[in-house]
Amino acid sequence: MITKFSKIEEVERAERMAADMGAGFLVGVGGGRSIDVAKLASVRVGVPFVSIPTAASHDGICSAQASLTIDGETTSVSAQAPFGIVADTAIISQAPKRLLAAGCGDIISNITAVRDWKLAHRLRGEEYSEYASALSRNDRDDDRRDRLT
């Protein structure tokens, strides 16, 4: 199925198609909209999904969250992380450069947000979650760098 919007109606349409076919897994190919629709539909149908991005513009290609429009408002919905990711660099490299720049910004923002959170925890007693932190970045690599600096 081809999706033009990341709306709950598209998720429901994908669910119906998956149920009618008896699908064992779903595949999201393209950008955020297609991947988010497949991500949420797959969890609602109870099957894994595979993410096949065509641009590296954000971390949604590998996250367990789906951004959807529900009742006219964009919201983040808990779904599931992909069972696998197939990223063809020959295809991704053909995407507009602004999308790659956006993806780099997304990665940097995740790293700095977690560091800000840790600092607020140390200085102000802000509640901190190692689990949530690990979802944002590779904790072990960052902690290794912390010990070296």
Stretches with model-predicted labels:
Residues E12-E15, I35-V37, D71-E73:
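A generic local structural motif
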Residues T3-S6, R33, A56, I92:
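Glycine-/small-residue-rich active-site loops that bind phosphorylated ligands and cofactors
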Residues V43-R145:
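A glycine/threonine-rich phosphate-anchoring loop and its flanking beta-alpha core
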Residues A18-A41, V45-T54:
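A short, small-residue-rich loop immediately preceding and capping a beta-strand
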Residues M1-F25, A95, A102:
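ATP/NTP phosphate-donor binding region
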Residues F5-E9, I35-V37, G60:
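Short active-site-adjacent helix-start/loop capping segments
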